[in-house]
Design a protein with these regions (language model features):
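Absolute protein N-terminus
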Residues: 1, 22-23
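Bacterial N-terminal signal peptides that target proteins for export
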Residues: 1-7
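Bacterial N-terminal signal peptides
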Residues: 8-15
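Sec/Tat signal peptide C-region and signal peptidase I cleavage site
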Residues: 16-22
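Short, glycine-/small- and polar/acidic-enriched structural segments
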Residues: 23-162, 173-177
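Acidic/His-rich structured neighborhood in mature extracellular/periplasmic domains
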Residues: 165
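Conserved, function-defining micro-sites of small-solute handling proteins
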Residues: 169
C-alpha cells in the first residue's frame, strides 16, 4: 500500500511537472511588415518558449491571411486594426486581443517624378494591397481628400514589399507603403 501511494505520488508529481513544462502550440500568420518584427524577435529570443508557448510563425500575404484563419491553418494573425472589421464582415469571425504598435506617419505613397499632384495620378497605375488593408484605405482616403476615388486610378493588388520592388524596377506609376 505504501509503495502504491508512493508510486501514485511520484506519478502525480511527474505529471504535474510535465504539465508545467508542456508548451501550448500556437500558429500565427503575419507579413514581413516592420511593425511585426517583435514577433520574430520574441521567438528567436526564446520569450514565447519561456512562457510555455511553441509558436510557429508563417508569412502569409495580407490578402489571404483571413483564409488561413478560416481554414484553421493558423490560429492567430498579426494584421492592421481595420482588417479585423473587414474579415468579420466577410464572415471570418475574429477578435483583436492586443495592439502591437501604432503607426504615426509611416504609411505613404511613392510616385514617379512626373506626378506633382493627385490629379496627375488620374488613369495611372497604383500598387496597393487588397481592399480592407491599411495601404488601400490610405490610398482611398488620400484620393477622396483630393476629389478622386479608386476608380480614377488603376489599382494593382500588391503587398508593400513587392510594390516597392516593382516601383524601383520601373513598374507602376505609384506604390503605397
Amino acid at each position: 500500500m505504501k509503495k502504491s501511494l508512493l508510486a501514485g505520488a511520484a506519478l502525480a508529481a511527474f505529471t504535474l511537472t510535465s504539465a508545467a513544462h508542456a508548451e501550448t502550440a500556437v500558429s500565427l500568420g503575419f507579413s514581413g511588415w516592420t511593425g511585426f518584427a517583435p514577433l520574430t524577435l520574441a521567438k528567436e529570443a526564446g520569450i514565447f518558449k519561456k512562457n510555455g508557448l511553441d509558436v510557429t510563425l508563417t508569412k502569409i500575404p495580407q490578402a489571404s491571411r483571413h483564409l488561413a484563419l478560416a481554414s484553421g491553418d493558423i490560429q492567430c494573425a498579426a494584421t492592421t486594426v481595420e482588417t479585423w472589421i473587414v474579415w468579420n464582415a466577410a464572415g471570418v469571425k475574429t477578435k483583436q486581443i492586443f495592439q502591437m504598435d501604432k503607426s504615426y506617419g509611416a504609411d505613404g505613397i511613392a510616385v514617379r517624378a512626373d506626378v506633382n499632384s493627385f490629379a496627375d495620378l488620374k488613369g495611372k497605375t497604383v500598387a496597393a494591397s487588397a481592399p480592407g488593408t491599411s495601404p488601400y484605405f490610405l490610398l482611398a482616403f488620400m484620393l477622396a481628400k483630393n476629389g478622386m476615388t479608386t476608380k480614377d486610378v488603376k489599382v494593382v493588388n500588391m503587398e508593400p514589399g513587392p510594390a516597392a520592388q516593382a516601383f524601383v524596377a520601373g513598374q507602376n506609376d505609384a506604390a503605397m507603403t
